[in-house]
Protein backbone atom coordinates (compact mmCIF):
# COMPACT_ATOMS: atom_id res chain seq x y z
CA UNK A 1 0.00 0.00 0.00
CA UNK A 2 1.22 3.49 -0.86
CA UNK A 3 2.26 5.43 2.27
CA UNK A 4 0.02 8.33 3.10
CA UNK A 5 1.10 11.78 4.15
CA UNK A 6 -1.32 13.99 6.01
CA UNK A 7 -0.82 17.12 8.03
CA UNK A 8 0.49 14.86 10.79
CA UNK A 9 3.48 14.09 8.58
CA UNK A 10 4.77 17.50 9.64
CA UNK A 11 3.66 17.22 13.24
CA UNK A 12 6.12 17.74 16.04
CA UNK A 13 5.60 17.15 19.76
CA UNK A 14 2.88 19.37 21.16
CA UNK A 15 5.42 21.24 23.23
CA UNK A 16 7.34 22.19 20.10
CA UNK A 17 6.62 24.99 17.69
CA UNK A 18 5.20 24.47 14.20
CA UNK A 19 7.55 23.36 11.44
CA UNK A 20 9.64 25.86 9.57
CA UNK A 21 9.77 25.91 5.77
CA UNK A 22 13.14 24.16 5.84
CA UNK A 23 11.88 21.49 8.23
CA UNK A 24 8.83 20.87 6.05
CA UNK A 25 11.08 20.41 3.02
CA UNK A 26 13.16 17.87 4.90
CA UNK A 27 10.05 16.03 6.10
CA UNK A 28 8.75 15.75 2.53
CA UNK A 29 12.13 14.65 1.20
CA UNK A 30 12.34 11.93 3.85
CA UNK A 31 8.88 10.62 2.95
CA UNK A 32 9.66 10.69 -0.77
CA UNK A 33 12.97 8.90 -0.21
CA UNK A 34 11.28 6.21 1.87
CA UNK A 35 8.76 5.71 -0.94
CA UNK A 36 11.56 5.16 -3.46
CA UNK A 37 11.00 8.29 -5.55
CA UNK A 38 13.90 9.19 -7.83
CA UNK A 39 14.53 12.79 -6.79
CA UNK A 40 13.14 13.29 -3.25
CA UNK A 41 14.97 16.52 -2.38
CA UNK A 42 14.19 18.17 -5.70
CA UNK A 43 10.53 17.15 -5.61
CA UNK A 44 10.17 18.46 -2.05
CA UNK A 45 11.79 21.78 -2.93
CA UNK A 46 9.63 22.26 -6.00
CA UNK A 47 6.35 21.41 -4.26
CA UNK A 48 6.97 23.58 -1.20
CA UNK A 49 8.20 26.44 -3.38
CA UNK A 50 5.21 26.07 -5.69
CA UNK A 51 2.69 26.34 -2.88
CA UNK A 52 4.44 29.28 -1.22
CA UNK A 53 5.04 31.05 -4.54
CA UNK A 54 8.80 31.18 -3.99
CA UNK A 55 11.63 30.48 -6.42
CA UNK A 56 14.70 28.51 -5.37
CA UNK A 57 16.60 31.44 -3.90
CA UNK A 58 13.58 32.90 -2.11
CA UNK A 59 12.67 29.49 -0.71
CA UNK A 60 16.15 29.07 0.75
CA UNK A 61 15.95 32.54 2.28
CA UNK A 62 12.58 31.69 3.85
CA UNK A 63 13.84 28.50 5.50
CA UNK A 64 13.35 29.78 9.06
CA UNK A 65 9.77 30.97 8.49
CA UNK A 66 7.11 29.05 10.39
CA UNK A 67 4.33 27.38 8.45
CA UNK A 68 0.83 27.95 9.73
CA UNK A 69 -1.54 24.94 9.98
CA UNK A 70 -3.33 25.80 6.73
CA UNK A 71 -0.03 25.92 4.83
CA UNK A 72 1.08 22.63 6.36
CA UNK A 73 -2.20 20.96 5.33
CA UNK A 74 -1.95 22.25 1.77
CA UNK A 75 1.66 21.14 1.37
CA UNK A 76 0.75 17.73 2.81
CA UNK A 77 -1.97 17.38 0.18
CA UNK A 78 0.56 18.05 -2.59
CA UNK A 79 2.90 15.52 -1.03
CA UNK A 80 0.16 12.89 -0.99
CA UNK A 81 -0.34 13.35 -4.73
CA UNK A 82 3.37 12.84 -5.36
CA UNK A 83 3.41 9.74 -3.15
CA UNK A 84 0.62 8.40 -5.36
CA UNK A 85 3.24 8.74 -8.15
CA UNK A 86 1.61 11.70 -9.84
CA UNK A 87 4.45 13.52 -11.62
CA UNK A 88 5.51 16.89 -10.25
CA UNK A 89 4.74 18.51 -13.61
CA UNK A 90 1.13 17.32 -13.41
CA UNK A 91 0.77 18.54 -9.84
CA UNK A 92 2.06 21.95 -10.91
CA UNK A 93 0.17 21.88 -14.22
CA UNK A 94 3.22 23.02 -16.15
CA UNK A 95 6.54 21.80 -17.51
CA UNK A 96 9.57 23.66 -18.81
CA UNK A 97 10.74 22.66 -22.29
CA UNK A 98 13.39 24.50 -24.31
CA UNK A 99 13.23 27.22 -21.62
CA UNK A 100 9.51 27.66 -22.33
CA UNK A 101 7.03 27.27 -19.47
CA UNK A 102 4.25 25.15 -20.94
CA UNK A 103 0.89 24.16 -19.48
CA UNK A 104 0.11 20.45 -19.37
CA UNK A 105 -3.02 18.58 -18.36
CA UNK A 106 -4.54 15.11 -18.52
CA UNK A 107 -4.95 15.35 -22.31
CA UNK A 108 -1.25 15.92 -23.00
CA UNK A 109 2.00 14.07 -22.61
CA UNK A 110 4.46 15.76 -20.27
CA UNK A 111 7.37 16.79 -22.54
CA UNK A 112 10.65 15.06 -21.71
CA UNK A 113 14.13 16.63 -21.75
CA UNK A 114 15.29 14.06 -24.32
CA UNK A 115 12.70 15.35 -26.78
CA UNK A 116 14.76 18.52 -27.07
CA UNK A 117 17.08 16.37 -29.22
CA UNK A 118 14.43 16.58 -31.96
CA UNK A 119 14.49 20.38 -31.79
CA UNK A 120 18.28 20.39 -31.94
CA UNK A 121 18.33 18.07 -34.95
CA UNK A 122 15.75 20.12 -36.83
CA UNK A 123 17.59 23.38 -36.17
CA UNK A 124 20.90 21.82 -37.21
CA UNK A 125 19.35 20.74 -40.52
CA UNK A 126 17.99 24.24 -41.10
CA UNK A 127 21.26 25.91 -40.10
CA UNK A 128 23.19 23.65 -42.47
CA UNK A 129 21.35 25.39 -45.30
CA UNK A 130 21.53 28.88 -43.81
CA UNK A 131 17.74 29.03 -43.70
CA UNK A 132 16.97 30.06 -40.12
CA UNK A 133 15.70 33.51 -41.15
CA UNK A 134 13.45 32.29 -43.95
CA UNK A 135 9.66 31.94 -43.93
CA UNK A 136 9.72 28.21 -43.35
CA UNK A 137 6.58 26.10 -43.11
CA UNK A 138 6.67 23.62 -40.26
CA UNK A 139 4.31 20.85 -39.15
CA UNK A 140 4.32 19.07 -35.78
CA UNK A 141 2.44 15.77 -35.91
CA UNK A 142 0.79 14.76 -32.64
CA UNK A 143 1.63 18.11 -31.08
CA UNK A 144 0.19 17.48 -27.60
CA UNK A 145 0.96 20.59 -25.56
CA UNK A 146 2.77 22.11 -28.56
CA UNK A 147 6.30 21.67 -27.20
CA UNK A 148 8.16 20.84 -30.42
CA UNK A 149 6.34 23.38 -32.57
CA UNK A 150 6.63 26.25 -30.10
CA UNK A 151 10.31 25.54 -29.42
CA UNK A 152 11.04 25.75 -33.15
CA UNK A 153 8.99 28.90 -33.67
CA UNK A 154 10.86 30.68 -30.88
CA UNK A 155 14.11 29.96 -32.75
CA UNK A 156 12.84 30.69 -36.28
CA UNK A 157 11.61 34.29 -36.39
CA UNK A 158 9.88 34.11 -39.77
CA UNK A 159 8.58 30.55 -39.72
CA UNK A 160 4.93 29.50 -39.71
CA UNK A 161 3.88 26.30 -37.97
CA UNK A 162 0.93 23.99 -37.55
CA UNK A 163 0.43 21.31 -34.91
CA UNK A 164 -1.97 18.41 -35.31
CA UNK A 165 -3.58 16.14 -32.72
CA UNK A 166 -6.58 13.87 -32.47
CA UNK A 167 -7.45 15.35 -29.06
CA UNK A 168 -9.25 18.67 -29.20
CA UNK A 169 -8.49 19.11 -25.49
CA UNK A 170 -4.78 18.80 -26.24
CA UNK A 171 -5.12 21.32 -29.07
CA UNK A 172 -6.68 23.81 -26.67
CA UNK A 173 -3.71 23.38 -24.32
CA UNK A 174 -1.31 23.87 -27.23
CA UNK A 175 -3.23 26.97 -28.35
CA UNK A 176 -3.01 28.43 -24.83
CA UNK A 177 0.70 27.68 -24.70
CA UNK A 178 1.19 29.43 -28.03
CA UNK A 179 -0.56 32.46 -26.61
CA UNK A 180 1.54 32.24 -23.48
CA UNK A 181 4.87 32.27 -25.31
CA UNK A 182 3.75 34.79 -27.92
CA UNK A 183 3.88 32.37 -30.85
CA UNK A 184 1.34 34.10 -33.07
CA UNK A 185 2.66 32.22 -36.12
CA UNK A 186 1.23 28.94 -34.82
CA UNK A 187 -1.88 27.07 -35.94
CA UNK A 188 -3.53 23.94 -34.60
CA UNK A 189 -5.58 21.38 -36.49
CA UNK A 190 -7.67 18.38 -35.45
CA UNK A 191 -6.07 15.58 -37.45
CA UNK A 192 -4.75 12.05 -37.07
CA UNK A 193 -1.07 12.84 -37.57
CA UNK A 194 -0.75 14.23 -41.13
CA UNK A 195 -4.08 12.96 -42.49
CA UNK A 196 -5.79 16.37 -42.80
CA UNK A 197 -2.74 18.45 -43.75
CA UNK A 198 -2.18 20.23 -47.04
CA UNK A 199 1.47 20.63 -48.03
CA UNK A 200 4.05 21.47 -48.91
CA UNK A 201 6.10 21.81 -45.73
CA UNK A 202 9.76 22.55 -45.31
CA UNK A 203 10.20 20.76 -41.98
CA UNK A 204 7.97 18.16 -40.34
CA UNK A 205 8.64 16.98 -36.79
CA UNK A 206 6.96 14.36 -34.64
CA UNK A 207 7.25 12.63 -31.29
CA UNK A 208 4.87 9.77 -32.06
CA UNK A 209 3.71 7.05 -29.67
CA UNK A 210 6.44 4.40 -29.84
CA UNK A 211 5.98 2.06 -26.86
CA UNK A 212 4.98 -1.47 -27.90
CA UNK A 213 1.48 -2.23 -26.64
CA UNK A 214 2.66 -5.12 -24.51
CA UNK A 215 5.25 -2.95 -22.76
CA UNK A 216 2.95 -0.13 -21.62
CA UNK A 217 1.97 -1.93 -18.41
CA UNK A 218 5.64 -2.13 -17.35
CA UNK A 219 6.25 1.62 -17.60
CA UNK A 220 6.90 3.70 -14.49
CA UNK A 221 3.65 4.64 -12.71
CA UNK A 222 4.32 8.33 -13.41
CA UNK A 223 4.07 7.52 -17.13
CA UNK A 224 1.69 4.56 -17.26
CA UNK A 225 -0.95 5.99 -14.92
CA UNK A 226 -0.85 9.66 -15.87
CA UNK A 227 0.20 10.12 -19.50
CA UNK A 228 -2.59 9.53 -22.06
CA UNK A 229 -2.29 5.98 -23.39
CA UNK A 230 -2.91 7.26 -26.91
CA UNK A 231 0.34 9.24 -26.57
CA UNK A 232 2.31 6.13 -25.54
CA UNK A 233 0.97 3.06 -27.35
CA UNK A 234 2.67 2.57 -30.71
CA UNK A 235 1.01 -0.72 -31.58
CA UNK A 236 2.28 -4.31 -31.30
CA UNK A 237 5.88 -3.46 -32.21
CA UNK A 238 5.84 0.26 -31.39
CA UNK A 239 6.17 1.24 -35.06
CA UNK A 240 2.55 1.84 -36.15
CA UNK A 241 2.83 5.62 -36.16
CA UNK A 242 6.15 5.58 -38.01
CA UNK A 243 4.45 3.54 -40.72
CA UNK A 244 1.67 6.14 -40.90
CA UNK A 245 4.26 8.91 -41.12
CA UNK A 246 6.12 7.09 -43.88
CA UNK A 247 2.87 6.66 -45.82
CA UNK A 248 1.87 10.34 -45.73
CA UNK A 249 4.80 12.66 -45.08
CA UNK A 250 6.81 12.30 -48.33
CA UNK A 251 3.96 13.84 -50.32
CA UNK A 252 3.78 16.76 -47.87
CA UNK A 253 7.48 17.68 -47.91
CA UNK A 254 9.02 20.05 -50.38
CA UNK A 255 11.90 18.61 -52.39
CA UNK A 256 14.88 18.81 -50.06
CA UNK A 257 12.61 19.19 -47.03
CA UNK A 258 13.33 17.49 -43.72
CA UNK A 259 11.46 15.08 -41.46
CA UNK A 260 12.70 14.73 -37.87
CA UNK A 261 11.15 12.20 -35.49
CA UNK A 262 11.83 11.05 -31.95
CA UNK A 263 12.85 7.42 -31.56
CA UNK A 264 12.33 4.88 -28.84
CA UNK A 265 15.31 2.86 -27.63
CA UNK A 266 16.46 0.37 -30.26
CA UNK A 267 14.18 1.67 -33.03
CA UNK A 268 16.63 3.65 -35.18
CA UNK A 269 17.35 0.93 -37.73
CA UNK A 270 13.73 -0.11 -38.20
CA UNK A 271 12.46 3.47 -38.56
CA UNK A 272 15.26 4.39 -40.97
CA UNK A 273 14.29 1.39 -43.10
CA UNK A 274 10.65 2.50 -43.18
CA UNK A 275 11.64 5.97 -44.35
CA UNK A 276 14.16 4.68 -46.91
CA UNK A 277 11.48 2.45 -48.41
CA UNK A 278 9.40 5.52 -49.35
CA UNK A 279 12.30 7.44 -50.88
CA UNK A 280 13.43 9.53 -47.92
CA UNK A 281 17.14 9.70 -47.14
CA UNK A 282 17.87 9.10 -43.43
CA UNK A 283 20.93 10.47 -41.64
CA UNK A 284 22.59 8.80 -38.65
CA UNK A 285 20.40 9.30 -35.56
CA UNK A 286 21.25 12.00 -33.02
CA UNK A 287 21.83 10.79 -29.44
CA UNK A 288 20.24 12.33 -26.38
CA UNK A 289 22.22 13.30 -23.27
CA UNK A 290 22.24 9.65 -22.18
CA UNK A 291 23.75 8.50 -25.46
CA UNK A 292 20.54 6.86 -26.68
CA UNK A 293 19.77 7.40 -30.40
CA UNK A 294 16.81 9.75 -30.01
CA UNK A 295 16.18 11.85 -33.13
CA UNK A 296 16.19 10.67 -36.74
CA UNK A 297 16.45 13.12 -39.65
CA UNK A 298 15.31 12.03 -43.10
CA UNK A 299 15.24 14.26 -46.17
CA UNK A 300 13.17 14.20 -49.30
CA UNK A 301 15.43 14.16 -52.34
CA UNK A 302 15.89 17.49 -54.09
CA UNK A 303 14.68 17.90 -57.64
CA UNK A 304 17.14 17.06 -60.37
CA UNK A 305 19.32 20.07 -61.04
CA UNK A 306 18.25 21.82 -57.85
CA UNK A 307 21.17 23.52 -56.16
CA UNK A 308 21.95 22.80 -52.56
CA UNK A 309 20.19 25.03 -50.10
CA UNK A 310 16.66 25.91 -49.15
CA UNK A 311 16.89 29.15 -51.11
CA UNK A 312 16.73 27.19 -54.36
CA UNK A 313 13.19 26.02 -53.74
CA UNK A 314 13.41 23.36 -51.11
CA UNK A 315 12.00 25.78 -48.58
CA UNK A 316 9.49 28.57 -48.82
CA UNK A 317 10.83 31.83 -50.28
CA UNK A 318 11.21 34.85 -48.07
CA UNK A 319 7.87 36.61 -47.75
CA UNK A 320 6.72 39.85 -46.27
CA UNK A 321 4.37 39.25 -43.38
CA UNK A 322 1.58 41.39 -42.05
CA UNK A 323 -1.04 41.07 -39.37
CA UNK A 324 -3.67 40.72 -42.11
CA UNK A 325 -2.01 37.77 -43.85
CA UNK A 326 -3.26 34.22 -43.47
CA UNK A 327 -1.88 30.83 -44.36
CA UNK A 328 -4.03 28.07 -45.81
CA UNK A 329 -3.61 25.17 -43.41
CA UNK A 330 -6.39 22.87 -44.54
CA UNK A 331 -9.61 21.83 -42.82
CA UNK A 332 -10.87 21.97 -39.23
CA UNK A 333 -8.37 24.58 -38.12
CA UNK A 334 -8.40 25.84 -34.58
CA UNK A 335 -6.18 28.84 -35.25
CA UNK A 336 -4.16 30.16 -38.14
CA UNK A 337 -1.22 32.27 -39.15
CA UNK A 338 -0.92 35.58 -37.30
CA UNK A 339 -3.95 35.12 -35.07
CA UNK A 340 -4.58 32.43 -32.51
CA UNK A 341 -8.27 31.50 -32.52
CA UNK A 342 -10.71 32.92 -29.99
CA UNK A 343 -10.66 31.48 -26.50
Predicted regions and their residues:
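Non-catalytic accessory regions of SAM-dependent methyltransferases
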Residues: 1-59, 64-67
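Conserved AdoMet
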Residues: 3, 41, 48-125
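Residue-level signal for inorganic ion chemistry
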Residues: 47, 85, 115, 148, ...
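Conserved SAM/SAH cofactor-binding pocket of Class I
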Residues: 114-218
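Mobile active-site "lid"/loop adjacent to the S-adenosyl-L-methionine
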Residues: 210-240
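Conserved Class I SAM-dependent methyltransferase catalytic core
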Residues: 236-299
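Short, intrinsically disordered C-terminal tails of secreted or membrane-associated proteins
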Residues: 332-342
Amino acid sequence: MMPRVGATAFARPRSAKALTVAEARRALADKFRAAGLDSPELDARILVGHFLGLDHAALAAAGARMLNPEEADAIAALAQRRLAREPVARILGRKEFWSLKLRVDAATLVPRPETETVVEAALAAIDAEGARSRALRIADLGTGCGALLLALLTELPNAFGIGTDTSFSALLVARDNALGVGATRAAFLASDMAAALDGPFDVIVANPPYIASGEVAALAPEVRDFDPRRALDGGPDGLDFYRAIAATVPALLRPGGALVVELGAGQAQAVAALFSAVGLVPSPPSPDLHGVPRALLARKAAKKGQKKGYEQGALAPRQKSSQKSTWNIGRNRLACSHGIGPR
